[in-house]
Amino acid sequence: MALPKDMRLKGHRTFNYIHKNSITYHGKLMTFKVARSNPGILLTHKLKNTSNKFRVAIAISKKVSKKAVERNKLRRILQEWLLTNIQKINNHKPYWLLVNLKFGDFCNDKSKLLEEFQNLMFKSRLIK
């Protein structure tokens, strides 16, 4: 299941803001870029609710897999984990998260991917 629209990041200005103003956390399989939210950037996208909410973008390069089916499967796995483990209580945190997967052969190892994702979520203090 996909992330709800109010949890997604979109737009090139948003990503430029994250790249310039973020703290980066590195793992073996992925990197996290966490930045304080800036709802003013999202006003151009005509979003009704641009409050300071936790928002996420998952970027998977073609270096990870040439097949879009596999990249989308990885994205869905991470989004499903987020939906089940980020409660509405944590949704008030005013942070934006960009997840970049590094290249590697972990398409078949879902547990390794989720373990690293969870470790980086704890490391970045987005969940407790």
Swiss-Prot record:
Where does this protein come from, organism-wise? Prochlorococcus marinus (strain MIT 9301)
Tell me, what does this protein do in biology? RNaseP catalyzes the removal of the 5'-leader sequence from pre-tRNA to produce the mature 5'-terminus. It can also cleave other RNA substrates such as 4.5S RNA. The protein component plays an auxiliary but essential role in vivo by binding to the 5'-leader sequence and broadening the substrate specificity of the ribozyme.
Asked if the record carries the keyword Nuclease, the reply is: yes
Q: Which GO terms describe its molecular function?
A: 3'-tRNA processing endoribonuclease activity; ribonuclease P activity; tRNA binding
Q: What does the subunit section of this Swiss-Prot or TrEMBL entry state?
A: Consists of a catalytic RNA component (M1 or rnpB) and a protein subunit.
Name the enzyme's class: hydrolase
Which InterPro entries did the record assign?
A: Ribosomal_Su5_D2-typ_SF (IPR020568), Ribsml_uS5_D2-typ_fold_subgr (IPR014721), RNase_P (IPR000100)
Catalytic activity entry: Endonucleolytic cleavage of RNA, removing 5'-extranucleotides from tRNA precursor
Question: Which GO CC annotations does the UniProt entry carry?
Answer: ribonuclease P complex
Q: What is this protein called?
A: Ribonuclease P protein component
Family stated for the protein in its record = Belongs to the RnpA family.
**Chain's gene name:** rnpA
Q: What is its EC number?
A: 3.1.26.5
Source organism superkingdom: Bacteria
Q: What are its GO biological-process terms?
A: tRNA 5'-leader removal
| Family matches, as NCBIfam families | rnpA
Query: What keywords is this UniProt entry annotated with?
Result: Endonuclease, Hydrolase, Nuclease, RNA-binding, tRNA processing
